[in-house]
Design a protein with these regions (language model features):
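Conserved pre-catalytic core of RNA-dependent polymerases
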Residues: 1-147, 151, 483, 492, ...
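Domain-level recognition of nuclease-like catalytic cores that cleave nucleotide substrates
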Residues: 652-706
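Extended C-terminal regions of large enzymes
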Residues: 320, 335-508, 512, 698, ...
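Basic, alpha-helical interaction scaffolds
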Residues: 238-314, 332, 367-380
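Catalytic palm subdomain of template-directed nucleic-acid polymerases
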Residues: 72-89, 174-206, 223-224, 261-263, ...
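Short, conserved micro-motifs composed of acidic
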Residues: 113, 211-248
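Active-site metal-binding core of divalent-cation-utilizing nuclease and nuclease-like domains
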Residues: 507, 557-614, 630
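Catalytic palm active-site di-aspartate
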Residues: 1, 31-36, 63-73, 99, ...
Length: 706
């Protein structure tokens, strides 16, 4: 069923009002973490649950647990009970009447198809169940199920994490149940108490017309910290909640458990699923950027969901990062010699945007530590106390967090970096809540800067005349296909397997260029300085792609018929009554030009306005774009003066279009492009240049870049 957008907006507003009312009046029980704001939901419940299991095991205590699952819970809750609960919780009468009137309008069409035709029942009224796609329905369900929490707590049965010998203190801190939406887990110190709690839950459920899904319900009995075989609990004649067998686990909120959490098995299961998803994403036809996004959103959460619940030794975290990079390299997403720190930086800063598992783990621990210290939940405070006093350093969230904080503070003191003014507006808040991530990113930038090979490009991007945002636009947009992105990043990092690189690694004796056999073969030499590649036309083809795009935009602006940009073939002379466009053609100047510079890439002569533009394009090495601009402006000054006199112009300008071979741009490039008719897009100029560089490198290196 498709829910109208207007209805979603309206129910969202109503949901906010109801939640605010419930929160102010403290009507909802803390045990329910579904729809609770400023809480970590399932992670909150799993923290408490894991501490109960750990406490029971360490102190050899008795514990009886039961997992209760409802059969089609969302579709079973009666509308009449929801309306009754709205009265109980003193919801505003207009809101209650609106919800009631909407429920009365809920209908469905039923069609039964058979061999002789079909039977159609229109407008069948719906008296049970709620939507599963709007903002209000989950909150209504939590309101309808909340009285169950109150009934369970009245029994004063449960498990206490409080070590006090006073019965009064233990009763005060009893944990009788945990509830997330309809996922219910019950706790008692013996089977008799558990049976009583199950009886309360069953009676309540039966009264409001909800049924247990017995095939998904189970119980577990622990005596003196060890699992024992218990008896099945009969809830009705012939209906039992079965005792969980020793070799069987129950999946509670996504985490398998029995009498304890088997951390080694859980780690291996998470690792296997993560690797499976990672390989599946890498084998897909997605672009490199979308592959990284898919890994961050679909693979990393398999691991991060259990951080803080499942014990992860640091060596396992590190090995997963290594395994990830190895798989990405095998599937040609990463290049084996590229700067690793760039892989984990955001794309807007020139990285690839991959989440490092080590960062995700440490940030999760620090965030949970902050959550434990700031959340006013009595059960969670007992969890914090247990982590601080009882658990080993490798399992304790506060202790691990202190280690990680100390580590990143030392790194930050050693590597002071100036943050750019382009940081997000909520930088201070992020720094307080997620300090490790913030400082680790600065640390990665520092390591990139100090890298002997990759640091050269980083230093170039930090120069005052460089357009940082524009220079990384190609990687942020992620348009390069298959292995092109990794090849270009490796070229920026001077990490391609050139002869110079192989000699530096001790693999080759000769470092001379495989084409010209004169200069040392480096990435910079291959992309812009090899005489043989120049003679073979590799640089010219790249240069002409940029010129062709600029020529196409000028023609479009002047109303000259053109094909699509990828089919455009510039002619030496293109003219209308008012405009003449010269392309790669010698311009008769009418007088001697001393330096012989009479053949710019494009000349636009507008007779009507008596103006002209001399446009010359260059795609030099990234480290030479400033020099190339000066050379172009100086080179055509004589031609500019000659044409001004010859054509009797009022205005004539030299427009240098300089783009680095791997995409680096000056901050004044946009101004130059804006002065060209049609205003060519800076990004399109960049992408034309870097695609030419990628094609050049593939042909030059052959199989050596694989």
């Amino acid at each position: 069923m498709i829910i109208p957008t207007t209805y979603n907006l309206l129910t969202g507003i109503i949901s906010d009002a109801i939640y605010h009312h419930l929160d102010i009046q403290q009507f909802m029980e803390e045990e329910q973490k579904g729809c609770r704001r400023y809480r970590q939901g399932t992670k909150h419940q799993l923290l408490i649950n894991s501490c109960i299991l750990e406490d029971c095991k360490q102190r050899a205590r008795n514990l009886s647990m039961a997992w209760v699952d409802y059969k089609k819970a969302y579709d079973s809750v009666p509308h009449s009970w929801i309306i009754r609960c709205l009265d109980i919780y003193k919801i505003s009468p207009p809101i209650k009447e609106f919800i009631k009137s909407q429920m009365q309008r809920w209908t469905m069409n039923i069609t039964l198809r058979h061999t002789n035709g079909e039977i159609h029942l229109p407008d069948v009224k719906v008296k049970r169940g709620i939507f599963q796609g709007d903002s209000l329905s989950p909150l209504l369900f939590c309101i309808a199920i909340d009285p169950l929490s109150k009934l369970i707590k009245k029994e004063s049965i449960g498990y206490s994490l409080n070590k006090s010998r006073k019965k009064k203190d233990k009763v005060k801190d009893l944990i009788s149940h945990l509830l997330f939406m309809d996922d219910l887990k019950l706790y008692a110190e013996d089977e008799k108490g558990l049976e009583k709690l199950i009886e309360v839950v069953h009676e309540f459920s039966r009264d409001i017309g909800m049924e247990f899904g017995l095939e998904k319900c189970a119980k577990c009995t622990i005596k003196k910290g060890k699992k024992v075989n218990g008896t099945n609990i009969e809830i009705e004649e012939g209906q039992f909640i079965k005792d969980l067998e020793s070799d069987t686990n129950y999946i509670y909120l996504g985490i398998e458990e029995n009498a304890t959490l088997e951390h080694k098995k859980l780690r291996e299961k998470a690792r296997t699923e993560y690797i499976r998803r990672l390989k599946k994403i890498c084998r897909s036809e997605l672009s490199p950027k979308n592959k990284i996004t898919a890994i961050n959103q679909m693979a990393i959460p398999v691991l991060s969901y259990g951080f803080g619940i499942i014990d992860w030794p640091q060596k396992d975290i590190d090995s997963l990062d290594v395994k990830t990079r190895k798989i990405l390299t095998m599937h040609k997403v990463l290049y084996r010699n590229q700067c690793l720190d760039r892989v984990y930086l955001p794309r807007r800063e020139g990285g690839m945007g991959l989440i490092e598992i080590n960062d995700a783990y440490r940030n999760a621990i620090i965030s949970l530590d902050f959550y434990l210290k700031t959340t006013p939940d009595k059960h969670l405070q007992n969890v914090k106390k247990q982590h601080q006093e009882d658990l080993h350093q490798n399992k304790s969230i506060p202790k691990l967090a202190d280690i990680f904080k100390t580590a990143h503070e030392q790194v930050n003191n050693n590597n002071q970096t100036n943050e750019t003014a382009s940081e997000a507006p909520d930088q201070e808040q992020c720094l307080k809540l997620y300090p490790y991530l913030h400082h680790e990113r600065a640390s990665k930038r520092e390591r990139w800067k100090t890298n002997k090979r990759a640091g050269l490009f980083y230093e170039e991007t930090q120069k005052s005349y460089i357009d940082q945002k524009g220079s990384f636009q190609w990687i942020q947009n992620g348009e390069l296909k298959f292995d092109e992105e990794r090849l270009l990043i490796a070229a920026q990092d001077q990490g391609l397997t050139t002869n110079g690189f192989l000699k530096m690694c001790g693999i080759r004796q000769d470092d001379k260029c495989r084409f010209c056999h004169n200069a040392t073969e480096s990435t910079s030499h291959l992309v812009s300085a090899c005489k043989i590649l120049l003679a073979d036309g590799h640089y010219t083809r790249r240069h002409n792609k940029v010129c062709s795009y600029i020529h196409w935009t000028i023609c479009r602006d002047k109303g000259i018929p053109t094909k699509e940009v990828w089919l455009h073939e510039p002619q030496p002379v293109t003219a209308t009554d008012d405009v003449t466009i010269f392309y790669d053609k010698e311009i008769p100047a009418g007088r001697y030009i001393e330096n012989g510079a009479i053949k710019p890439d494009i000349v636009v002569w507008d007779r009507q306005s008596r103006s002209a533009l001399i446009i010359d394009v260059s795609v030099p090495n990234d480290f030479g774009i400033n020099r190339a601009e000066r050379e172009k402006v100086t080179k055509y000054q004589d031609l500019k003066n000659a044409l001004k006199d010859e054509w009797q112009l009022k205005d004539i300008a030299v427009i240098p279009v300089i783009i680095g071979a791997t995409g680096l741009m000056k901050d004044n490039l946009q101004c130059y492009l804006d002065s060209i008719p049609g205003m060519p897009k800076k990004y399109q100029v960049q992408i034309a240049a870097i695609r030419g560089t990628v094609s050049l490198l593939k042909q030059a290196l052959g199989t050596h870049f694989q």
